[in-house]
Amino acid sequence: MVMLIKCFLVTEKSVAELEKNVLTAIVDMRARKEHIKKEIEKLFNVEVERVNTLITPKGEKKAYIKLKPDYSAEEILSKLGVF
């Protein structure tokens, strides 16, 4: 199985999005929203509310992953050692 999530972004905007319970990640170009959702739910044992994707001018695919209110995006990043 191919890992769809390449890395999580820690920028000024992505840190502001954490307050809205949204994770920001660079994902594989072939990844579809439903596959990203399933992978996040499986890896971190959380429920995802929705996934929005866009392709950056650099040619990377970025995903905004909104978690359900019962889960904390900040906790996930702290488990990964980002914070």
From Swiss-Prot:
Under the heading NCBIfam families, the entry gives: PRK14548.1, uL23_arch
Similarity field: Belongs to the universal ribosomal protein uL23 family.
Gene Ontology biological-process annotations: translation
Identification of the protein by name: Large ribosomal subunit protein uL23
Underlying gene? rpl23
Organism, by scientific name, is Archaeoglobus fulgidus (strain ATCC 49558 / DSM 4304 / JCM 9628 / NBRC 100126 / VC-16)
Which Pfam families does the protein's record reference?
A: Ribosomal_L23 (PF00276)
Q: Does the keyword rRNA-binding apply?
A: yes
Q: What keywords are assigned to this protein?
A: Ribonucleoprotein, Ribosomal protein, RNA-binding, rRNA-binding
Purpose: Binds to 23S rRNA. One of the proteins that surrounds the polypeptide exit tunnel on the outside of the ribosome.
Q: Record keywords: Nucleus included?
A: no
